[in-house]
């Protein structure tokens, strides 16, 4: 998030994953039952203050129902869009030639409709099977929690002791000061829940962090099965999950309080999931 047309912008900090993965389920009499998709893009936002929104995920679900089913279908069709590995990918063009202003809900509809229409266009190529092997695995791995040192705790207390209207060196200093003190109360390690599901030659993995796209692409590249995609913020929300290289760059996703676990966490999680997928590959 460098801001629009920031003159200090050098290059993107990481890769993107433009692929939309999906699982389509229908009955033996060809009636659509459900479709679960996965896309690596941060939520879009753009709603009035005080409004709670399902964002493009919800709009995608509605659009898929419009495209695939009769509104009176019973039971009703279920469309689902899941959040892919998009902890470091958002929808903002930071170098636009012309800045466009969107109306409330407008941009999320653009994203959702383009995604839904792209999936719909590929449905004719889907090969359905009456039977596929199913398998699942769950595990928890310990991850060390990053803790503030005494100097940082003293800084946080000093910041929070100031009046709310005191001049700030950084607009978010009170926010991060509070996060620092909160993290000091965390246990020394957490149990990180990880899941992997096999559906035929497809696998789905689940991670309880805002996962960087680099990690999602690594899992896709290393998977022992034909296709794999990852759902982030699944079974928990433990903050951002930068890679070692991103920690070295020092973006805000690596700051203490935004990131809460050890530097090697992303790599430990990826390695564990690949081991789980290897076992699922052998399952019949």
Write out the residue ranges for each language-model feature.
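Non-catalytic substrate/cofactor recognition surfaces at enzyme active-site rims
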Residues: 1-284
């Amino acid at each position: 998030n460098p801001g629009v047309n920031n003159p200090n912008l050098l290059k993107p900090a990481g890769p993107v994953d433009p692929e939309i993965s999906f699982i389509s389920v229908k009955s033996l009499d060809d009636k659509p039952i459900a479709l679960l998709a996965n896309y690596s893009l941060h939520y879009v936002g753009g709603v009035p203050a005080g409004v709670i929104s399902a964002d493009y995920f919800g709009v995608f679900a509605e659009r898929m129902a419009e495209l695939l089913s009769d509104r009176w279908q019973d039971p009703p069709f279920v469309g689902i869009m899941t959040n892919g590995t998009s902890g470091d990918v958002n929808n903002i063009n930071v170098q636009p030639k012309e800045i466009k202003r969107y109306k409330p809900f407008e941009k999320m509809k653009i994203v959702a409709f383009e995604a839904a229409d792209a999936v719909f266009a590929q449905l004719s190529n889907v090969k359905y099977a009456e039977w596929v092997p199913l398998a699942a695995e769950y595990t928890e791995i310990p991850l060390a929690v990053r803790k503030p040192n005494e100097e940082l705790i003293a800084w946080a207390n000093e910041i929070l002791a100031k009046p709310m209207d005191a001049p700030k060196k950084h607009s978010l200093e009170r926010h991060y000061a509070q996060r620092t003190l909160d993290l000091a109360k965390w246990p020394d390690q957490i149990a990180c829940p990880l899941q992997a599901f096999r559906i035929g030659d497809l696998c789905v993995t689940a991670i309880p962090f805002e996962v960087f796209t680099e990690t999602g692409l690594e899992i896709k590249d290393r998977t022992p099965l034909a296709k794999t995609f990852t759902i982030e913020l699944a079974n928990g929300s433990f903050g951002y999950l930068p890679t070692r290289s991103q920690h070295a760059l020092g973006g805000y996703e690596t700051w203490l309080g935004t990131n809460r676990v050890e530097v090697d966490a992303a790599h430990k999680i990826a390695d564990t999931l690949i081991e789980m997928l290897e076992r699922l590959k052998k399952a019949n």
